[in-house]
Amino acid sequence: DASNAQKQHDVNFLL
Protein backbone atom coordinates (compact mmCIF):
# COMPACT_ATOMS: atom_id res chain seq x y z
CA ASP A 1 0.00 0.00 0.00
CA ALA A 2 1.65 3.21 -1.21
CA SER A 3 -0.27 5.34 1.32
CA ASN A 4 1.05 3.26 4.21
CA ALA A 5 4.59 3.38 2.80
CA GLN A 6 4.41 7.18 2.70
CA LYS A 7 3.21 7.22 6.31
CA GLN A 8 6.18 5.09 7.39
CA HIS A 9 8.52 7.44 5.53
CA ASP A 10 7.05 10.43 7.39
CA VAL A 11 7.57 8.67 10.74
CA ASN A 12 11.18 7.85 9.88
CA PHE A 13 11.75 11.47 8.89
CA LEU A 14 10.46 12.66 12.26
CA LEU A 15 12.74 10.24 14.10
Swiss-Prot record:
- Kindly provide the name given to this protein in its UniProt entry: Lectin 80 kDa subunit
Which organism does this sequence originate in? Penaeus setiferus (Atlantic white shrimp)
**Which function does this protein serve?**
Sialic acid-specific lectin. Has hemagglutinating activity towards erythrocytes from several species, with high activity towards, rabbit, mouse and guinea pig erythrocytes, and low activity towards human erythrocytes. Hemagglutinating activity is blocked by treatment of erythrocytes with V.cholerae sialidase.
List localization entries: Secreted, Extracellular space
Q: Which domain of life is it from?
A: Eukaryota
Q: How does it assemble?
A: Heterotetramer of two 80 kDa subunits and two 52 kDa subunits.
| Any GO CC annotation of this UniProt entry | extracellular region
Which free-text remark accompanies the cofactor? Binds Ca(2+). Mn(2+) or Mg(2+) can also be used to a lesser extent.
**Tissue expression as described in the entry:** Hemolymph.
A GO biological process this protein is involved in? humoral immune response
* Keywords from the UniProt entry: Hemagglutinin, Lectin, Secreted
Q: Which family does it belong to?
A: Belongs to the tyrosinase family. Hemocyanin subfamily.
Cysteine pairings via disulfide bonds: none
Name what cofactor the protein needs: Ca(2+); Mn(2+); Mg(2+)
Which GO molecular function annotations are given, in alphabetical order? monosaccharide binding
